[in-house]
Amino acid sequence: ELGTAYYSDHLAASGDAHQLYELFPIPFTLTEAQRVADRIAYAQDVLGCAIAVENSTYYTNVGDLRESEFLQEVVTRSNCRVLLDVNNIVVNWKNHQVESPHAYLANVDLSKVSYFHVAGHEYNPRFQMYVDTHSTHVEPKTISMAKSLSQISGKDILLEWDNDVPALAEINRGLACLNSLITSEA
């Protein structure tokens, strides 16, 4: 009815009749991958379009699969798309040292990616971890990864900035810088 190519949402837990205020991770298990894939397949049938699931940050390790393996299981079983948040891959690596960005990306089928997200993150000394705040400039490592992925796949990159949003002129300067870094040959 809306004519959209796909609908996107975070690959995170939710509940009936309850509101969760943060993106809680789904346990990274084969059982949960099948359960989630079944729900995504059903939703795609009802909506009449593909769903693109976005990888989330997680602040505790859950399950026996690596996040990329879980994501790929869900994608394969449901035939859904991926909205790949490059910043979240970096944040999860910094916090857990479980799966390097290179190892993560080796498990992702880039042909299923609809587009990429980049954002800023910050270290929170109180919690002693990095937090996906979307409140600062994107770090160079994240930009470099997104650039490589975009060049390989031909997919677009979206900048997210949700908190502590600066003046429009500052955002435009950041976008111009990001664009020049992404489009440069080096």
Where on the chain are the PLM-derived regions?
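Active-site acidic/histidine proton-transfer and metal-coordination neighborhood
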Residues: 1-82
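Conserved, mostly hydrophobic/aromatic
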Residues: 7, 51, 85, 116, ...
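Active-site beta-loop-alpha junctions enriched in small/polar residues
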Residues: 11-12, 56-58, 87-91, 118-123, ...
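Gly/Pro-rich active-site loop or hairpin
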Residues: 23-33, 92-154
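Alpha-helical packing segments of well-folded alpha/beta enzyme cores
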Residues: 36-39, 43, 145, 149, ...
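Catalytic cores of glycan-processing enzymes that make or break glycosidic bonds
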Residues: 37, 41, 161, 186
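Distinct, well-ordered alpha-helical segments
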Residues: 61-77, 92-106, 169-172
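C-terminal helical cap(s) of enzyme catalytic domains, especially alpha/beta-barrels
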Residues: 167-186
